[in-house]
Amino acid sequence: MAFLKKSLFLVLLLGLISLSICEEEKRENEVEEEQEDDEQSELRRSLWSKIKEMAATAGKAALNAVTGMVNQGEQ
């Protein structure tokens, strides 16, 4: 009976250690994924800001071109 208790205790102990290691690895993976998501979000924000800047510049250039054509037409 004592042998069974020791064996059961050993199995439970090893199971807890294994579970603990798996949980730690899972947390590390989640942290890495969050960091990657943060980096991707930052890249998206910078990309959108560049697109907005380009659109604003193109809009201003188009407005200036149209204004120039209208002014030439009036003369």
Swiss-Prot record:
Q: Where is this gene product found? A: Secreted
Q: Where is the signal peptide?
A: 1-22
Q: Does the keyword Ribonucleoprotein apply?
A: no
Tissue specificity is:
Expressed by the skin glands.
Disulfide pattern: none
Does the entry feature the keyword tRNA-binding, yes or no?
no
UniProt keywords, alphabetically: Amidation, Amphibian defense peptide, Antibiotic, Antimicrobial, Cleavage on pair of basic residues, Secreted, Signal
Cite the Pfam families for this sequence: DD_K, FSAP_sig_propep
GO:BP terms for this protein? defense response to bacterium
| Any one Gene Ontology cellular component term annotated for this protein | extracellular region
Q: Which residues form the propeptide?
A: 23-43, 74-75
- Glutamine amide is found on Q72
Describe the function of this protein: Possesses a potent antimicrobial activity against Gram-positive and Gram-negative bacteria. Probably acts by disturbing membrane functions with its amphipathic structure.
UniProt similarity note: Belongs to the frog skin active peptide (FSAP) family. Dermaseptin subfamily.
Query: Protein name, please?
Result: Dermaseptin-A3
Query: What is the organism lineage in this UniProt record?
Result: Eukaryota, Metazoa, Chordata, Craniata, Vertebrata
